Amino acid sequence: MKAPAKSSGSSSPAVSTPAPSAAPDPGRKPGEHGELDLFSLLAEHEHEQVSVYYDPSTGYRGIIAIHSTVLGPALGGTRFWNYQSDRAALIDALRLARGMTYKAAVAGLNLGGGKSVIIGDNRTPRREALFRAHGRHVESLKGRYITAEDVGTSTSDMEYIKAETNHVTGLIGRSGDPSPVTAYGVYRGVKACARYRYGSDSLAGKSVALQGCGSVGYHLAKLLFAEGAVITCTDIDPQRVKRVVEECGAKAVAPDAIYDVRATIFAPCALGAVINDDTLQRLQVEIVAGAANNQLAEDRHGDELERRGITYAPDYVINGGGLINVNAELHGWAPERARSKAGEIYDTLLRVFEIAREEGVPTYRAADRLAEQRIAAIAKVRRNYV
């Protein structure tokens, strides 16, 4: 996609940047000495802005990445994770923000893509102060970015953010937990995959290897079980696994063993990059369709899925229900309308599969093209001053 590049923003109320000790070497390649290489990372996928904020009183360290505001304000959740490095946190925020742009575009929403990450242990008891600091960070962007719940955060955390900014969704008493709507959209997407692959969208008797039994994975398991699917599940939390086993008649396996399960469908519903060089050698499935973000470690792994004859539901298409749910809150939609809109993921995926077949490209590229067509069309409209 082609969008005008913008400068990187930075807000940091207790951080100063020292002068460089030496002039930059014009012959040095960006990033070759291991520095953060911020602008190269921004330019790679044409992100508009990154804002970094540090609050010494709470220990808050946060990054907000805005990929695109062509279709509207950037919306994306806040992820609270103990990253191995600041660079890993930044790259995660950038990838997730780009995914949100494309997710909003293919879902037909008037929103751009953004994401925020808080670096640290999400088991901290100091949640109010920490999330109020994050709320001030969000507020500093003056509506260019709207946040919501994500991995490691909750609706209660969103209430703390609300004390400092109105640019937050997923609040208690409003749209609330997006997991049920996200799971319903994924369920409809799985059925679309079955329709494309087998000519029928029935999941009765289909075997599903479910990776992740958290909020979305649990609700998805219930929907799959209700239709007669046979589930094998895993999660790093034994209590989550126990609930799915007891309520959905699932078989449990160790976390790493899920890749070796022979099944019709692999449904990744935890963290990303699970389709990689190692797991591709182990998967024994015909369909990959789940709620996790950034499922492909690299684009070439999507090419390899295609080469192996595995039908892949692009992650940002099939997991768009959560974004649809928070968009419903922004516009005052009834819950039934949000669920109905999430159900349209079925038709969107069939369109993606059609483009892939017609153009002879992997499904992840077909999804990108569908999103980019809409973004480019609106960018042309908005270039005129009114």
Residue ranges and their predicted role:
Residues 180, 215-220, 274-275, 296-298, ...:
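Short glycine/serine/threonine-rich phosphate/pyrophosphate-binding segments
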Residues 104-110, 144-149, 198-207, 255, ...:
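Flexible, glycine/charged-enriched surface loops at secondary-structure junctions
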Residues 236-317:
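Rossmann-like adenosine-cofactor binding region
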Residues 90-97, 128-139, 159-162, 183-191, ...:
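Predominant activation on well-ordered alpha-helical scaffold segments within soluble catalytic domains
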Residues 1-172:
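N-terminal ligand-binding/catalytic initiation module
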Residues 177-265:
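Glycine-rich phosphate/diphosphate-binding loop of Rossmann-like nucleotide-binding domains
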